[in-house]
């Protein structure tokens, strides 16, 4: 079988695709893959490192306001469809899977015109513009949140979950916290604002720092590279020298860390949600206000409804509120266990299997 995968722009579109590819490689080693992205997108750095054949087309996104740039966008979209058709004819895939981003719009639409079976994978609780456009043309639509089904044709839509969820459940308990100077036997909260960090979360952590004194739990905080030096300088002048806190610029083995902690605090991106729910980890989510259609708030609300997470709006985040929310969960074993059970219930630990079954129905 030959599978062409396309998606890009953000890690939320790329990492689920890579998790799926790795799963299929184990299940059916003879399967051939080709990943189509853009030369300037994050995928151009990540996919080749994963040793997956990679080709590019040139495309850009629409401006949401009236802009002459949109004429160029339309031109690039039309020319990219022709380029995508050329790539598809050369590779001759049995199925094409789009995981989001403008590049998948051109490639999946081109595959539809060439009468090749197509699937789109929607990670969020509100669909992106590309997947809304493609939904009328594709054969199947794989979703991660039941709520998003209402945006798509019922007969095409299947709840598969996010392949990242299946990848993380294989991670075992370890003493990884000792690598950060923390005690693996103590309750621990991991706090982060995404790969680049988040200013509001950073400010709240700085306010919260002295409040963590004499807590029974530990705090592992990933500030993001761009805030790390500034934060270190600020904390240097703090009167408190706390041994139950570790501050890192970035945590490379985040999934392994989450598998060995008791609570996660961070943004409400689809990939993070797939990971911590698969692990059955309770969370405090601070949705980013800077994403399209405010989809992170919708992602978080779907989990608040079932009691798996608590949500703090970005505009309301302070150090005191952050510590109070962490205390309320980590110092209350019954509540933490109830949230963990609810989180596990929302996880889909066989997401790659489910998506692979959808592929096999089309081939």
UniProtKB/Swiss-Prot annotation:
Alphabetical GO biological process terms: carbohydrate metabolic process; cell division; cell wall organization; lipid glycosylation; peptidoglycan biosynthetic process; regulation of cell shape
Annotated InterPro entries: GlcNAc_MurG, Glyco_trans_28_C, GlycoTrans_28_N
Membrane topology qualifier: Peripheral membrane protein
EC annotation from Swiss-Prot or TrEMBL: 2.4.1.227
Matching Pfam families: Glyco_tran_28_C, Glyco_transf_28
Recorded catalytic activity of this chain's protein: Mur2Ac(oyl-L-Ala-gamma-D-Glu-L-Lys-D-Ala-D-Ala)-di-trans,octa-cis-undecaprenyl diphosphate + UDP-N-acetyl-alpha-D-glucosamine = beta-D-GlcNAc-(1->4)-Mur2Ac(oyl-L-Ala-gamma-D-Glu-L-Lys-D-Ala-D-Ala)-di-trans,octa-cis-undecaprenyl diphosphate + UDP + H(+)
GO cellular component: plasma membrane
UniProt cross-references to Gene3D superfamilies, sorted A to Z: Glycogen Phosphorylase B
Pathway annotation: Cell wall biogenesis; peptidoglycan biosynthesis
Main location, first listed in the record: membrane
Binding locations of UDP-N-acetyl-alpha-D-glucosamine: 10-12, 124, 195, 251, 296
Location(s), subcellular: Cell membrane
Keywords, alphabetical: Cell cycle, Cell division, Cell membrane, Cell shape, Cell wall biogenesis/degradation, Glycosyltransferase, Membrane, Peptidoglycan synthesis, Transferase
Molecular function GO labels: undecaprenyldiphospho-muramoylpentapeptide beta-N-acetylglucosaminyltransferase activity
Family: Belongs to the glycosyltransferase 28 family. MurG subfamily.
Function: Cell wall formation. Catalyzes the transfer of a GlcNAc subunit on undecaprenyl-pyrophosphoryl-MurNAc-pentapeptide (lipid intermediate I) to form undecaprenyl-pyrophosphoryl-MurNAc-(pentapeptide)GlcNAc (lipid intermediate II).
Record-given protein name: UDP-N-acetylglucosamine--N-acetylmuramyl-(pentapeptide) pyrophosphoryl-undecaprenol N-acetylglucosamine transferase
Organism: Enterococcus faecalis (strain ATCC 700802 / V583)
Gene label: murG
């Amino acid at each position: 079988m030959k599978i062409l995968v396309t998606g890009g722009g953000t890690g939320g579109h790329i990492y689920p695709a890579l998790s799926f590819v790795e799963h299929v490689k184990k299940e059916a080693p003879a399967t051939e893959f080709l990943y189509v992205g853009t030369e300037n997108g994050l995928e151009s750095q990540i996919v080749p490192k994963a040793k997956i054949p990679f080709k590019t087309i040139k495309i850009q996104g629409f401006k949401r306001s009236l802009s002459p740039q949109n004429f160029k966008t339309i031109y690039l979209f039309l020319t990219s469809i022709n380029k995508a058709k050329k790539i598809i004819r050369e590779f001759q895939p049995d199925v094409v899977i789009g995981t989001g981003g403008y590049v998948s719009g051109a490639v999946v639409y081109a595959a539809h015109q060439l009468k090749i079976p197509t699937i789109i994978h929607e990670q969020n609780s509100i669909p992106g513009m590309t997947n809304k456009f493609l939904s009328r043309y594709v054969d199947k639509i794989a979703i991660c949140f039941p709520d998003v089904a209402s945006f798509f044709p019922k007969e095409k839509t299947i709840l598969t979950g996010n392949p990242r969820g299946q990848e993380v459940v294989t991670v075992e308990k370890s003493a990884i916290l000792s690598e950060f100077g923390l005690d693996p036997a103590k309750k621990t909260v991991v706090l982060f604002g995404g790969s680049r960090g988040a200013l509001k979360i950073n400010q709240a952590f700085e306010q919260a720092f002295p409040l963590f004194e004499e807590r029974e739990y530990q705090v592992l905080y990933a500030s993001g590279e761009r805030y790390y030096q500034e934060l270190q300088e600020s904390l240097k002048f703090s009167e408190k020298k706390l041994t139950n806190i570790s501050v890192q610029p970035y945590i490379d083995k985040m999934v392994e860390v989450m598998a060995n902690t008791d609570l996660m605090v961070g943004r409400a991106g689809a990939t993070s949600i797939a990971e911590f729910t698969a692990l059955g980890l309770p969370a405090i989510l601070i949705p980013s206000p800077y994403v399209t259609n405010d989809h992170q708030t919708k992602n978080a609300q779907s989990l608040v409804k079932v009691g798996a997470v608590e949500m703090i709006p970005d505009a309301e985040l302070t150090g005191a509120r952050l510590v109070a929310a962490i205390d309320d969960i980590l110092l209350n074993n019954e509540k933490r266990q109830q949230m963990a059970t609810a989180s596990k219930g929302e996880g889909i630990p066989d997401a790659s299997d489910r998506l692979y079954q959808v592929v096999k129905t089309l081939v």
